[in-house]
Amino acid sequence: MERNTNPNNLPVELNRTSLYLGLLFVFVTGVLMSSYFFN
């Protein structure tokens, strides 16, 4: 994921959105893993 062709064109919201998506992905993965292990 090194698409640093135009770093000045990237807004600050993109970093925040990717951070939120990463947290959501970790949360969903944790819920799926816990439900899989507790089954």
Curated annotation (Swiss-Prot):
The keyword Iron does not apply. It holds the Pfam family PsbL. It is a single-pass membrane protein. The keyword Transmembrane applies. One of its GO terms (cellular component) is plasma membrane-derived thylakoid membrane. The chain crosses the membrane at residues 18-38. Keywords: Membrane, Photosynthesis, Photosystem II, Reaction center, Thylakoid, Transmembrane, Transmembrane helix. PSII is composed of 1 copy each of membrane proteins PsbA, PsbB, PsbC, PsbD, PsbE, PsbF, PsbH, PsbI, PsbJ, PsbK, PsbL, PsbM, PsbT, PsbX, PsbY, PsbZ, Psb30/Ycf12, peripheral proteins PsbO, CyanoQ (PsbQ), PsbU, PsbV and a large number of cofactors. It forms dimeric complexes. This is Photosystem II reaction center protein L. It comes from Synechococcus sp. (strain CC9902). The gene is psbL.
